[in-house]
A protein has these predicted regions:
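Internal maturation/activation junctions in enzymes
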Residues: 66-88, 114-206, 278
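Catalytic alpha/beta core of large soluble enzyme barrels
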Residues: 24-27, 32, 73, 77-78, ...
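Extended, hydrophobic alpha-helical segments in both membrane/secreted and soluble proteins
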Residues: 100-103, 135-139, 298-301
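Active-site loops and adjacent core secondary-structure elements that bind or stabilize anionic groups
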Residues: 1-2, 207
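Function-dense linear segments that define catalytic or interfacial modules
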Residues: 4-91, 96, 101-111, 215-218, ...
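Hydrophobic, well-ordered secondary-structure elements that form the walls
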Residues: 48, 104, 207, 305, ...
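Alpha-helix capping and helix-loop boundary segments enriched in small/acidic/polar residues
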Residues: 35-39, 56-64, 87-99, 111-130, ...
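Acidic, low-complexity intrinsically disordered tails
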Residues: 326-357
Length: 357
């Protein structure tokens, strides 16, 4: 679902945003094409990356990570091949990036807070402020080196308007608007030198990248400590990071009573993100009479997300009470073996040099 009001009022573009992509994190201007070689149209592409915030030791570590992410995607824009002219011209003139998180559940578990905890909302606010600040700072630095993107004048950034100016002020009811970084100086630098990119941030589902990084999915609470992910290569078992030391700190999806905590987490993130967040609503029928989720509950969640400035939403998840068990020849397929494995991990030493890299 794409909420066009928020997609445009809280956008970095002066041009209208009319739609999002399948995963609901991309909110870029588009224009129709008359034929395959039509360069006057605009096809928006997903130029994405994600930072594993679960591994962060301090917020200022984001400065280098954001700079590397922005510079890597900056080179990718010029390096990759484009089969359609409207995609190439739009991407190279706007140079829109979408960098997000993986491992947020791990990050909150390390801090000892649950998604429903107001302290978690404050931590996410501080994290996302630092994240967007350093992304913009990196793009501004590249603009000093290479020049601003071709369509920079068609962004609100060119007028010194930042995401902290256009977000839904109802978010201040969740976390007070106390900012920790020097946004005024950054605003002046952006007005003077521009940005190399029209957008910097977007929160994708990140199913694949989280597996490769052994991180929790994007900003999602895990469904269980041990999950099984299916792919063309076959099933893959994945255990939440630092299970041994953080088992009791993780927020599991179906243990959450309602969507309030998650909605608030996404809201404070959207305050700073210049594209959208692939957010979900999750319902456990077991929490309601007769295992029936009331329409009024879902309607209330919809209205709440609108109030707090969500731009898009992706899935409505429902707990079907089915396990992730699969039939395959493996030495941990039985529940008893899984429990033994988790118990072994719970007592294992996790601070080895290899894990610290």
């Amino acid at each position: 679902m794409c909420i066009r009001d928020s997609c445009n009022t809280h956008s970095s573009f002066k041009d209208p945003v009319r739609m999002s992509n399948l995963c609901q994190e991309i909110t870029l201007p588009t224009e129709p094409i008359d034929h395959i070689d039509d360069e006057m149209g605009e096809i928006a592409l997903c130029i994405l990356s994600a930072i594993n915030v679960g591994r962060l030791n301090k917020l200022d570590d984001l400065e280098e990570l954001c700079d590397l992410s922005v510079r890597g995607l900056e080179e990718l824009i010029d390096y990759q091949k484009y089969p359609v002219a409207a995609a190439e011209s739009a991407t190279k003139t706007r140079r829109s990036l979408g960098i997000g998180f993986i491992g947020l559940a791990h990050y909150l578990a390390r801090q000892g807070v649950a998604y429903d905890d107001p302290n978690a909302w404050q931590l996410v606010h501080n994290l996302t402020e630092a994240f967007q600040y350093y992304l913009l700072k990196a793009s501004n630095q590249i603009a000093k080196e290479k020049g601003a993107c071709g369509n920079f004048s068609r962004t609100k950034y060119a007028d010194g308007i930042l995401p902290i100016d256009t977000y839904k002020k109802d978010v201040d009811d969740i976390v007070p608007n106390n900012l920790n970084y020097d946004w005024d100086t950054l605003r002046d630098d952006i007005k003077e030198f521009g940005l190399r990119h029209s957008t910097l941030s977007a929160q994708m589902p990140s199913e694949s990248s989280s597996v490769v990084s052994n991180a929790t999915n994007g900003i999602e609470p895990p469904r269980d400590y041990l999950s099984i992910k299916k792919s063309k290569k076959g099933p893959l078992k994945q255990i939440v990071p630092s299970y041994g030391s953080l088992k009791n700190n993780y927020t599991l999806l179906w243990e959450m009573k309602g969507n309030k905590g998650y909605i608030n987490v996404v809201a404070v993130m959207q305050k700073f993100f210049d594209q959208a967040i692939s957010g979900n609503w999750s319902y456990n029928p077991a929490d309601y009479p007769d295992n029936d989720v009331p329409v009024s509950v879902m309607a209330q969640d919809l209205l709440t997300t609108y109030k707090y400035g969500w731009k898009t939403s992706y899935y409505q998840n429902t707990n079907d009470m089915k396990s992730d068990e699969i039939e395959e020849p493996t030495n941990i397929s039985k529940p008893t073996d899984v429990e033994c494995l988790l118990a072994e991990l719970e007592t294992a030493e996790e601070d080895c040099e290899a894990c610290a890299i």
